[in-house]
């Protein structure tokens, strides 16, 4: 897990350690409605991607050329993305909400599932001249996982000797994951063959 890197617009995105069962993990750090291109490497990548040994996922977000939007909804949540631009300024915002209680209700462990996941991302770009570009990338993720288990029924054995194991639970689980991320980058391109970038980022997580 620690040997896989995720970059958005050249900025490394840090993710908190998640519970190993995976049920508490909510939305992906990548918002598909905001993506322009995706690059993936399983090895032999450039030194700019640090010294991770496994893989690198490099995402580039859009810079809208006009007003645009995307909307989707389902029984488990929805997403909304809006973007606009002028000659020297562009911004793109994305909001996602997910509640997959019906999906988790189909597992072997029966109970009351109430998971709620919220995610907001923004990408703002300012181009004061042809050589300079200032951009900001922000991300807020709020995940709330509630679970009151009742029982779990597990079947094992062979077709001629089938067994069933039934367990009753008492108690509950309540997890909260709050992640805040912001990054500012200054790009300077004096000519076609050279470019320089200065990046500063801050990250905070509460679990």
What spans do the regions from the language model cover?
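Transmembrane beta-barrel wall of Gram-negative outer-membrane proteins
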Residues: 76-97, 110-148, 172-204
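N-terminal periplasmic accessory domains that precede
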Residues: 24-28, 40-43, 47-69
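Solvent-exposed coil/turn segments that connect beta secondary-structure elements
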Residues: 1, 11, 43, 62-64, ...
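Short acidic/polar hinge/loop motifs at secondary-structure boundaries
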Residues: 11-40
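Outer-membrane beta-barrel and related beta-rich outer-membrane complex signature
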Residues: 18, 105, 135, 140-156, ...
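Flexible, surface-exposed loop regions and adjacent strand-edge segments
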Residues: 23, 109-113, 150-164
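Extracytoplasmic loops and strand-loop junctions of Gram-negative outer membrane beta-barrel proteins
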Residues: 19-23, 40-41, 62-65, 103-108, ...
